[in-house]
Regions:
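N-terminal pre-catalytic "stem/leader" segment of glycosyltransferase-like enzymes
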Residues: 1-83, 88-93, 104, 273-278, ...
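Alpha-helix capping/helix-boundary segments
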Residues: 76, 102, 127-129, 175, ...
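Membrane-proximal helix-turn-helix segments that form the acceptor-binding/catalytic region
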Residues: 89-91, 102-121
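A short, active-site helix/loop in glycosyltransferases that binds the activated sugar's phosphate group
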Residues: 106-107, 118-142
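Conserved catalytic-core segment of nucleotide-activated headgroup transferases in glycan assembly
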Residues: 150-225
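Nucleotide-sugar-dependent
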Residues: 222-264, 270-278
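A short acidic/histidine/glycine-rich donor-binding loop in glycosyltransferase catalytic cores
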Residues: 283-289
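A charged, aromatic-enriched C-terminal amphipathic alpha-helix characteristic of glycosyltransferases
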Residues: 290-293, 297, 303-333
Length: 333
């Protein structure tokens, strides 16, 4: 029978990389023979859920023709509990790919029954899998993505061989990245040059070793430059701990920044305690550090052999994630 993926009809912002991960998943699923099971969501001002019930009414009949259903979790739609309820009442083989989990921040997972119903649950990292197993999930049903795929339209021009330079790219929401304010005033980091990519540059982020590079469409990486790509968050240069359980969440999460940098052929710098640190080390994808203040010495001490291993590892992984191999591997079993 036909395999389907649930598609909630909603607009996306072309410059918002947060919407790129689910869009890439949909494209890979189409290539693998999945068809969209489309549901048009009502307006968010449908407070009583009257229009939602009308919009979601066809879902029950649509589910009857599906042989398998793939869901990206969480999905955002008004009164989404109505959709979940209909899915829970079917006996469809269900695959759920997790993008985010409130329970990792100490919150309550309102749609936990949907996760537990999944025949195949795809999560970010081994750490996220271990967490769910402690919550009573069946580990045999959990597949680990390691990092998200990142499909591209345009790559940067052919880069010279990796030499372990001091130019470090950071792409994302610059307004929320509090640690950026501390970069220019830190003498230990004065030998490094940070290239900042984002929609706007905060007024309190400035310095001789910082250059604002503007923004780019997530699928067009031609303007992304740097010797390294930085995956960091929080309010400190010496750790990724921050408010709202940020540090704890990074222990499980695979940031989409990681995929962005690797897709462009750029080695990465990640927090040693993050959920992706082991993946980065095992595949020779860059450096893992406890503090950004370690970077000048760590970069300077790199041997030619280590640089060659990183260059090779990044090249192999870049090819995989640009062709959707991470998700395809999870779909095989």
């Amino acid at each position: 029978m036909q395999r389907y993926f649930l598609k909630i009809i909603a607009p996306r912002d072309a410059f918002n990389a947060e919407g790129k991960a689910p869009a890439d998943v949909e494209n890979i699923l189409r290539q693998e023979g999945f068809k969209p099971l489309e549901i048009r969501a009502p307006r968010w001002d449908d407070l009583l859920g009257i229009n939602a019930r009308l919009c979601y009414q066809p879902l029950e009949k649509l589910l009857q023709k599906a042989g398998e259903l793939f869901i990206q979790y969480p999905f955002y739609a008004p009164h989404s509990h109505l959709i979940i309820r209909k899915i829970l009442h079917t006996n469809l083989p269900l695959t759920v790919l997790v993008h985010d989990l409130d329970m990792l921040r100490g919150g309550r997972e309102e749609s936990e029954p949907l996760l537990r119903k999944a025949k195949r649950l795809i999560v970010h990292t081994e750490a996220m899998k271990a967490f769910l197993c402690k919550q009573g999930f069946n580990g045999e049903n959990i597949k680990v993505l390691q990092c998200f795929d990142y499909l591209v339209e345009h790559l940067p021009a052919q880069k010279p061989s990796f030499t372990g330079g001091n130019d470090i790219a950071f792409a994302g929401n610059l307004e929320k990245s509090e640690f950026l304010k501390l970069l220019s005033g830190n003498k230990i980091l004065s030998s490094l040059h940070f290239l900042l990519y984002g929609a706007t540059l905060p007024k309190d982020v400035f310095g001789e070793n910082l250059t604002y590079q503007g923004c780019f469409r997530p699928a067009d990486l031609r303007t992304l430059n740097g010797s390294w790509g930085l995956v960091w968050d929080g309010e400190s240069l010496t750790t990724c701990q921050g408010s709202h359980g940020l540090g704890e969440y990074l222990r499980y999460n695979a940031s989409h920044k990681l995929s962005l940098y690797l897709a462009s052929g750029m080695p990465v710098i990640v927090w040693q305690e993050s959920g992706v640190a082991a993946f980065v080390n095992q595949n020779h994808l860059g450096l893992t550090v406890n503090s950004l203040e370690e970077l000048p010495e760590r970069i300077e001490r790199l041997t030619e052999n280590e640089k060659a291993l990183i260059s090779e590892g990044v090249g192999i992984m870049s090819e995989k994630i640009r062709h959707g191999e991470m998700l395809r591997n999870c779909l095989k079993n």
